[in-house]
Regions:
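Short, conserved loop-to-beta-strand elements that form functional interface hotspots
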Residues: 307-316, 321-352
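C-terminal edge-of-domain segments
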Residues: 353-373
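Conserved core of the sugar-phosphate nucleotidyltransferase
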Residues: 44, 104-186
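Conserved N-terminal catalytic core of the sugar/cofactor nucleotidyltransferase
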Residues: 33-91
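RNase III-family endoribonuclease catalytic core
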Residues: 204-322
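Short aromatic/hydrophobic "clamp" motif used to bind/position activated sugar donors
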Residues: 94
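SAM-dependent methyltransferases
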Residues: 1-7, 11, 40, 170-172, ...
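N-terminal glycine-rich phosphate-binding loop and ensuing alpha1 helix
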Residues: 2-57
Length: 374
């Protein structure tokens, strides 16, 4: 086994990507890009450890995909993500790559590893073939290099180099700043960094997402409580009683949230918004749903449709169905024709039949966001 740890940085917000989904979560067949890239790099050599640095909101979800990697909370900059990851590195060397470089060839990895003892940092580069002008001066293009990742560094030197408040854009710049030794090796055009959405077609190693559909169910039930405002589907209903709950008690929204989370395999509402957390006390459930919808899109899905059944002896739901559908369509960012709201009673049986509360059953269908068609 190599005395080398591989770190893959996946904590970015994809602000320049111009797609609904973060670049690290676009699907390559059935795999998110971060998993596809990390497995690809892992297959090229026998690394001692593989660390994936991710956005805090996505860490637990990532763990659903594999137990083969360690997951670390990333920072709000590339350098902070590296620093967080380095706390868990005990090997002599560390190789750091960006998830946005999806098609790195095996030859680059092998060359980096072969040269690991020749300098403090080994860096793949490309030469410039076009004329280069800085302001009004023509620069000798033979002196210009395009720096790529992954880069392989001596762990102790990199830790020392990053012990600073100065932000660097790559490891070699930090190591060079403390007079560490740098060795440049030949990079590859295949290691192109994915930044803008229209660059996806320039990465031939990426397959289009599968056309699978994913279905989840959600169920919630709440008792009535007098002298509270009733919220249902994001609407305020004209009654002098509402739902007993830690939040505002919107039983319909809670059911839909669980259905959405079930469809993408992300757990349940309590894992995202625990009722032991005071910041969710009395919270508007529309905010919870908006958070989950953003999460759904961020991690690579689109909402296909929602079907929901409200089980209530009271209040009567039919007068509000149209408004509920409009409210949900706006919250879910889908057309209302893809939302169905049904209502039934419990035929005066049990808790619901005695008009003590309401239950809701929801079904959500998702599909992968198809970046090939955008």
């Amino acid at each position: 086994m190599l005395d080398v740890t591989l770190i893959v940085l996946c904590a970015g917000n994809s602000t320049r990507f111009e797609h609904k989904t973060k670049k690290q979560w676009i699907r390559i067949d059935n795999e998110p890009l971060w998993l596809n890239v990390t497995k690809r790099l892992a297959s090229f050599s026998n690394f001692a450890k593989i660390i994936v640095a991710s956005h805090e909101d996505e860490l637990n979800y990532m763990r659903n995909f594999t137990d083969d990697f360690a997951f670390v909370k990333g920072g709000d900059t590339r350098q902070k993500s590296i620093l967080n990851s380095l706390q868990f590195v005990t090997t002599k060397y560390v190789m750091i790559s960006d998830v946005a470089r999806a098609c790195i060839p095996q030859s680059v990895i092998e060359n980096l590893l072969e040269q690991k003892e020749s300098a403090d940092c080994i860096v793949p580069v490309l030469n410039v073939t076009d004329t280069v002008i800085y302001e009004t001066n023509t620069i000798n293009r033979d002196e210009v290099k395009l720096i790529q990742t992954p880069q392989l560094s001596l762990t102790s030197t990199l830790k020392k180099a990053l012990d600073t408040t100065i932000e660097f854009t790559d490891e070699s710049s930090a190591i060079k700043a403390i007079n560490g030794t740098i060795k440049y090796i030949q990079g590859s055009n295949e290691s192109k960094k994915l930044t803008l959405g229209n660059e996806l077609d320039e990465l031939p190693c990426l397959k289009e997402p599968s056309k699978n559909f994913f279905t989840g169910t959600g169920f919630d039930i709440h008792a009535f409580e007098d002298n509270k405002v009733m919220f249902l589907g994001g609407l305020k209903l004209p009654y002098d009683y509402g739902f007993k709950a830690h939040s505002d008690g919107d039983v319909l929204i809670h059911s839909i949230i669980d259905a959405l989370l079930g469809a993408c395999g992300a757990g349940d509402i309590g894992e995202f918004f625990p009722d032991t957390d005071l910041k969710y006390k009395g919270i508007d459930s529309k905010l919870l749903l908006e958070h989950i919808v953003r999460f759904i899109y961020n991690v690579g899905y689109e909402i296909v449709n929602i079907d929901t059944t409200i089980i209530a002896q009271k209040p009567k739901i039919n007068p509000f169905k149209h408004e509920i559908k409009n409210s949900l369509a706006a919250l879910l960012n889908i057309e209302k024709q893809f939302i169905n709201v049904k209502a039934t009673t419990a035929e005066k049986m049990g808790f619901i039949g005695r008009a003590e509360g309401v239950a809701v059953q929801s079904i959500a269908t998702l599909k992968y966001y198809n970046w090939k068609q955008k």
